[in-house]
Amino acid sequence: MESILTSIKKMLGAEEGYEQFDTDIIMHINSVLMILTQLGVGPAEGFSIEDDIPTWGDFLDDSTKYESVKTYVFMKVKLIFDPPLSSAVIESMNKMINEFEWRLNMEAELSKSN
């Protein structure tokens, strides 16, 4: 599995070796991981990263059910770290984020009941 930090950096358009903004990106990723924990996704005790070592597999037991987590984390980090200039794009991203939150929460609830 790919590193959480590395994959988010790639989606943000930053090269893997460019570490200038790693501290900022890590802080934003950890904020989003906290939200996911509150939604019931990921380890119940919470999860955070400090570098490019933790992978998506470390955060998620069953990555096939939660594949959208990667997109969700990217979109939330993008809006915080490098928001689009267009208000229409921001609105569209926020709608998608809301849908991801609803779907991820539903999947987490279904997984708990099984």
Located regions from the model:
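Conserved short "hinge" loops at termini or chain/domain junctions
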Residues: M1-K65, N98-N114
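Short, hydrophobic/amphipathic alpha-helical patches that form generic packing surfaces
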Residues: T71-D82
